[in-house]
Amino acid sequence: MPTKIFILQTLALVATASTVFAASPDFVDDIQPILERNCVRCHNAEKTKGGLRMDTYKSIMQGGDTADAIVPGNPAASELLVRIHLRPIDEGVMPDEGRALDPKEIALLNDWVKAGAPWPEGVTLTEQKPEPVKRVSIPARTPESATDAAAILDDILRRENEESESMTTGTVDDLVFLRRATIDLIGRIPTTPEIREFEAWSGDRREKLVDKLLAHPRFADRWTIFMADMLRIRSSIEGGNQLLAFINSSIAEAKPYDIMVRELIAASGRANSNPAVGFILGDDANPMELAAATAQVFLGVRIGCAMCHDHPFDDWEQRDFYDLAAFFGKTQKVGNQRMGTVYTTEGSKMTVLWPPEDKAKPEEREPVSPRFPFKNTKYDSTPNYLTRFEKLREQQQQKSIGGSGTESLDALLDAVNPSAGKKADPVLVEAEKESRLLNVHGDIYRTSELREKLAGLITNPRNDFFARAYVNRVWAEMIGHGFVEPLDNFSPYADLHHASTLDFLSREFVASGYDLRSLIRIIVLSDTYRRAPLTADIPLTVRENSERNFTAAPQRRMLGEVLYDSIVTAGHLKDFKWPAGANMKEVSSEIRVPTGEYIMVEGGAPTPEMQTEKPMVRNDGYDLESSLKLDFNSILTPKEASELERMRKESDEHIKALEMAAAQKDEKQKVMKYTTKTVTNKVDDNPRFDSAMRMATPAPPAHFLRVFGQPERAGLGEFRDSSSSLRQQLMMLNGRMTHEASRVGSLEPIHQLLEKDEAEAIVYAYREILTRPPTEEEKTFALALLSEDPHEGMADLRWALLNCNEFRFIP
């Protein structure tokens, strides 16, 4: 609602209150193409979304179900103008499929409405089919190195931008690159020792930095956050934490992306034994939900809109969707209440039936035969990137199992061991043993031949949708914009730009064996990634056009988890900042204690236990900045290997009988009575903060991470909210974490430095928090701040630096 109010106020400033209309843009040349490209497909005689038709003057003036689309002379009252100003993440944004209107198009529509919305007599709008995607040539040669591949990328992008009206900025300096790459690759700002090490390197220190960051233990944590958003991982649902741990371990061991996805789609069993099954459990093993999620997440295609009818915005038919859903049609989610287990298995009955239940009687519906509705790319001869991929997989297979070198591509995909040559993780070894146990008891956790087939079809290197969808997401994560937006909407009607750059990166991704680190290395070493942002004096339309064409860096705010960890890093909050006992305080709390009396309660009623009361939320936001820390190794450790046998031996009838007996038990029980007491304890106020990368996810709605954009991950097509809010400002200004990060602890290096050289301490603070030295003006101001009390002054300076935009935004 606040967004809409702001838009209405903005529109009101440019609207004319009188009936004297301004000069109008030309309808045929300026307005008609915008409406036909972006609106008529969903608002015509056959499709009247929201009750609105926009193909004739009469119909558009009649408005829709809820408001007037156009009020001549009054943009603020015109619902169409309001909705095209909304952000892509806002409900009701128009157009809700394809690209958003650019500022020039919005200005033209606004001027047209201000001028009275003139419409030539007899003109009827028709849907304008998308123009063919423009491409430039891609070199056929194999890049000699990642640096060479990055140079090819830059050249392709330059040629694609030759006719664009955009400004190209220079590349950033070394320290800015250090900060940007460290934030993007390992999810926090660089530390002072890391800055010094980087500056001491000779030669191409940027390449050395990239190699170091890609090998850093935090790389897996940072990119697990990326994958958790993409896969909608939720700790609160069955298998959520196990899936999160599986993704983390897969990235840590450099498991190829296609192998990971195969495991996610085909997994069966229990999450504790086969953590990849969390993807299937995440959608309750529902074939319809899984079909929509699989296509949208892994292929970037929103075929889910064809679940109930032919796709209203694309060419997919409802039968296409049902054919895809049939691959999941025999998958079952089984729950055993007595054993406390939930698992997936494969049944014998197809649950996906055609025609849909609202279009036929039950006896008329037939099981659907699975069909993959996406076509692979066909080549007259095997292209270079596929030849490289096949050769790489053959080498991997020979290294892991001693292959003959004559296997087919499918055999190479099935046999490759992504962990060949790597040190074995004992936890994963145990998990693999547990997985082999599942095969012994295959009658319980039956594998899915249908889903295994689907996994192979989706990850086939000739299926261009698969690689392009992932590359588009990674590119947007690193650069700020995707080649297609929304990121999961590859469609003939979507605005795909810089298609040749996307093609090149996708092919290199396939050729690398779907290696995430190789993809990121190419991007980070490119000049495109190193571009500086445009200055504030550049007109908005020029800046937005340049950012969209990847010739200037957009302003990107840190992810919530990255901002959290950067505050922890800047403030030395991962370790104690004071000696033990240096900050003792008294804290009161309420606990439940026994009274010595007994009371009678009904059978089955919960028995009170001695426990502390749930903590109140503090005004300083402390409880909104902490959360449950996850131990991924513990989550992946198999437990109770004998559980399968116990499940087999207990008949369903026996389990049900026990459950019914427990439910019917109603005899009264004698239990202890408890009362609430307030107690006061002395605590050492010397807090440490864990990394946000391994918190249970998503965080509660009021948590720091959610306030700074972490999505709920409840539905498809949900992306991070990068907009700013007053709540964010208050949490940074008044939050406990910012306060603790600002305080100067006696165990911090800067504490001793303050005693010796205040000017040097100021330089240290700037480099530690902003990864740069202060200007002379900033140094003068800081010295004045430290003049009365150096330690309090330094705390104030650090607090100010943590709250500035320069800290929160990626340079």
Regions found by a protein language model. Name each.
Residues S145-R180, D184, I189-R218, W223, ...:
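Primarily short, surface-exposed interaction patches in extracytoplasmic proteins
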Residues M1-L8:
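Positively charged n-region of N-terminal signal peptides that target proteins for export
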